[in-house]
Amino acid sequence: MKEFDLESYDYYLPKELIANYPVLPKEKAKLLVYDRRSQTITHTTFEHVLDFFPKNALVVLNDTKVMKARLFGSKHAFLPSKTTEVFFHRFFKDNTALTQIKGKIKAGDKIFFDENYCAEVLELLHNGQRLIAFYDNQTPLNQENILKLLEQYGHMPLPPYIKRADESLDAHEYQSVFAKHIGAVAAPTASLHFSQHTLEKLLKDFKHAFLTLHVGAGTFLGVETKDIREHQIHTEVLRIPKKSQEILQKSQEILCIGTTALRSVEYFKRLENPNQEAFECDIFLHLANPILHVNYLLTNFHLPKSSLLMLVSAMIGLEKTKEIYKIAIEKKYRFYSYGDGMLIL
C-alpha cells in the first residue's frame, strides 16, 4: 500500500524555502491553520496563534533545553587548530558519554579542547557512536562539570540542513523561552515560535502541563526502510512529573506544542500502570500506528521521508498532508527548524 511506501513521503522543496535564520519578532512568522472539521485552511501569523486554540484543550509543552553539543578540538595537545568535531549525544554513565566524532578515530585517541580539558575515546560502537570520557588534566569530569565544559566550549547544534556556522543569536533563538531541563541536542522547534509575551498569555488563559523529552540526534536521521512499518525509531529520555501525569490522565482534549510533546503524550497514555516519572520513549507514529490520544498539534514543516512527516500524515492522512505542503510551498512558507508553522485542529 502506498501509505507505507517510503517514496510516498518524498516531495520537492526549493532550497530558498529552507529557513537559515528565524523570523524576528517571533510573532511575525507565518502560520497555516488547518481545521479538519470544516476542511478549511487559514493563513495567518503567530501573533494570532492562541485565537485558534480550543478553549477547553489542555496544552502540553516540552521544556527540554538544548545543550551546546558541538565541540571542536585537536588530536594533539599543542596544536592551535581545532579541526576534530565531537557531537555530544547523551550521557552514558559516570563521566562517559555517547558521541559522534567526525573523521578517523580509534580507541585510545585523545581530543584536546584546551591545555586542561580533553576527552579519551574508550570504544567505537557499531552504530557509529563513540564512547568517550572527559578529563580535566587527569581528573575525570562528572556530569555537572561536563555540562559546564559544553557551555564554555560548545556550539549550538544547528541541524545539518542549516548551511552556516552557529552565531551568537542561535544561543537564544534555537532555545524555547520556557526551556528548563538541559539534555537535548536539537530544539523542539514548534516551541521556538513562542515569545515571552505569548507564553505568558497561554499559561494564563489555558490549562497546561509540562513534560521533558530530550530530543536526541536520531531526530535528524531519515527513515531508510522501503516499508516504513519496518523502521526502528531512536530512543529518547522522557520525564513526566507526577503533577503533569495526573493532569494528562484527566484530560479528554489535548493540544500538543510540537511533535516531541505529542509523541511523549501518546507514549505515556498507552502505558497500563505508569508508576515512575522517567521513561525511554521510542514510539513511532504513522498510518499503521495512528494517534489515539492527542486532538490537536502545533508543528513546523518537516523534511521529506522523515518520521515527523509520517506523524503528521497519521493525523490528517497522506493525501491531505501532501496537499497542504504543496500549498505551503506555493505560498512561500519557510520550512524546517527556523521555519513557519502549522496548526492542525
Curated annotation (Swiss-Prot):
Give the catalysed reaction(s), semicolon-separated.
7-aminomethyl-7-carbaguanosine(34) in tRNA + S-adenosyl-L-methionine = epoxyqueuosine(34) in tRNA + adenine + L-methionine + 2 H(+)
Q: Does the keyword Transport apply?
A: no
InterPro entries xrefs: QueA, QueA_dom1, QueA_dom2, QueA_sf
Q: What Enzyme Commission number does this protein have?
A: 2.4.99.17
Q: In which pathway does it act?
A: tRNA modification; tRNA-queuosine biosynthesis
Keyword annotations from UniProtKB, A to Z: Cytoplasm, Queuosine biosynthesis, S-adenosyl-L-methionine, Transferase
Classification via SUPFAM superfamilies: QueA-like
Annotated Gene Ontology MF terms?
Answer: S-adenosylmethionine:tRNA ribosyltransferase-isomerase activity
Which GO terms fall under biological process for this protein? queuosine biosynthetic process; tRNA wobble guanine modification
Recorded GO cellular component terms are: cytoplasm
Top EC group: transferase
Q: Where in the cell is it found?
A: Cytoplasm
Q: What does this protein do?
A: Transfers and isomerizes the ribose moiety from AdoMet to the 7-aminomethyl group of 7-deazaguanine (preQ1-tRNA) to give epoxyqueuosine (oQ-tRNA).
Q: How does it assemble?
A: Monomer.
Q: Which family does it belong to?
A: Belongs to the QueA family.
Under the heading PANTHER family, the entry gives: S-ADENOSYLMETHIONINE:TRNA RIBOSYLTRANSFERASE-ISOMERASE
Alphabetical list of HAMAP family matching this protein: QueA
Q: What is this protein called?
A: S-adenosylmethionine:tRNA ribosyltransferase-isomerase
Source organism per entry reads Helicobacter pylori (strain P12)
> What phylogenetic lineage does the species belong to?
Bacteria, Pseudomonadati, Campylobacterota, Epsilonproteobacteria, Campylobacterales
